[in-house]
Swiss-Prot record:
Assembly behavior: Homodimer. The RNAP catalytic core consists of 2 alpha, 1 beta, 1 beta' and 1 omega subunit. When a sigma factor is associated with the core the holoenzyme is formed, which can initiate transcription.
Source lineage: Bacteria, Pseudomonadati, Spirochaetota, Spirochaetia, Spirochaetales
Annotated region (Alpha C-terminal domain (alpha-CTD)), positions in chain: 259-344
Family that this chain belongs to: Belongs to the RNA polymerase alpha chain family.
Catalytically driven reaction(s): RNA(n) + a ribonucleoside 5'-triphosphate = RNA(n+1) + diphosphate
EC identifiers of the protein: 2.7.7.6
Name of the protein in question: DNA-directed RNA polymerase subunit alpha
Function: DNA-dependent RNA polymerase catalyzes the transcription of DNA into RNA using the four ribonucleoside triphosphates as substrates.
Listed HAMAP family: RNApol_bact_RpoA (MF_00059)
Species in which this protein is naturally found: Borreliella burgdorferi (strain ATCC 35210 / DSM 4680 / CIP 102532 / B31) (Borrelia burgdorferi)
GO molecular function: DNA binding; DNA-directed RNA polymerase activity; protein dimerization activity
SUPFAM superfamilies found in the cross-reference section: C-terminal domain of RNA polymerase alpha subunit (SSF47789), Insert subdomain of RNA polymerase alpha subunit (SSF56553), RBP11-like subunits of RNA polymerase (SSF55257)
């Protein structure tokens, strides 16, 4: 093969050394060598950009706060500009603190709602450690979220999702169906910082080869070692189609477009919904994925015997494929063309 013959004239990295790490794996220093001159910068910059932009993680995407005071009055916070009675910080500051919580769910979980209450009589400080419940693991437990007065009780509810990169509150609000729930901007990336440098290294008589030195800091949600493995896999997947360029260039777009259209005609039974949800949808003549996403939450909620749990189940299942109720066909095709596999 031409590619294999071409690579025979290149020096390919043979050594990958893991030089340093912290006990929790959140920091790692790696050296990779030897590279042909110039390839150290090319590979280092590529890995750095992928690490910072494309490693998936968890974030809190929505919250509901109710403040209960000793005079029996209560208030549900309706927006980020509302003040929370009995709390020193304003809501915007609290939201900023919440976005800094480093957490993850159990293996395979992509969405979870947690609810809990906290009383000023028991503690005057709400910390990230209070979020560690129901299978949620928190990595910066001492982070202060809010300061409470002695006579306040807070009822709290938070939505945690799995995702990638940055998602605005406007996008997250598409998945909210209850009033007085505040959608948050979400930063899913578990990577805090990446740096790299390129040094000279010797191979035989030549000393002008590149040695790539990379340092990775994570939030603890993923180890530095797993992060660099995942980044390398992402780069490989994006470049692999170019290896068989002639075979792929003429067929890939039409194939993905066709497969995406077929998925919209797929029976909703393949979404593995509960029998109750399937029966309710059948009564509304919703039988395909395309028909389902064309409905909005309000339409489904008005259907007979269609309860909150069924709606939440459907929203969660669609969300796992990056789809949502009320989505346009064009947007759905665009999403599905990038990931056309749905479990059979």
């Amino acid at each position: 093969m031409l590619v294999e013959k071409f690579l025979k004239d290149f020096t390919i990295p043979e050594k990958i050394e893991f030089l340093k790490s912290q006990g929790d794996g959140s920091y790692g220093k790696f050296t990779i060598y030897p590279f042909e001159r110039g390839f150290g910068i090319t590979i280092g910059n590529t890995l750095r950009r992928v690490l910072l932009s494309s490693i998936e993680g968890y974030a809190i995407t929505a919250m509901r706060v109710q403040s209960n005071n000793k005079d029996s009055s209560s208030k549900v916070v309706s927006s980020e500009f509302d003040l929370i009675p009995g709390v020193s910080e304003d809501t915007l500051e609290i939201i900023a603190n919440i976005k800094n919580i480093h957490l993850k769910l159990g293996e395979g979980e992509q969405r979870k709602t947690i609810s809990f209450s906290v009383s000023g009589k028991d503690t005057n400080v709400l910390k990230a450690s209070h979020f560690e419940r129901d299978g949620v693991e928190v990595f910066n437990k001492d982070l202060v979220i809010a300061t409470l007065s002695h006579d306040v009780n807070l009822d709290l509810e938070f939505q945690i999702n799995y995702g990638r990169g940055y998602v605005s509150s406007e996008q997250n609000s598409k998945y909210l169906e209850e009033v007085n729930v505040i959608a948050l901007d979400s930063i899913f990336s578990p990577i805090e910082k990446v740096s790299y440098s390129v040094e000279d290294t010797r191979v035989g008589q030549r000393s002008d080869y590149d040695k790539l030195v990379m340092e990775i800091w994570t939030t603890g949600v993923i180890s530095a070692k797993d992060a660099i493995k995942k980044a390398a896999s992402i780069v490989r997947e994006f470049l692999f189609p170019l290896v068989d360029f002639e075979d792929n260039v003429n067929t890939s777009f039409e194939k993905s477009k066709s497969e995406s259209s077929n998925l919209l005609d797929m029976s909703i039974e393949k979404l593995n919904l509960s029998v109750r949800s399937l029966n309710c949808l059948a009564k509304e003549n919703v039988r395909t994925l395309g028909e389902l996403i064309s409905k909005n939450a309000e339409e489904l909620s008005k259907a007979r015997n269609f309860g909150k749990k069924s709606l939440e189940e459907i929203i969660e299942k669609l969300g796992s494929y990056r789809l949502y109720l009320g989505m346009s066909k064009e947007d759905a095709l665009s999403v599905l063309s990038k990931n056309v596999k749905i479990s059979e």
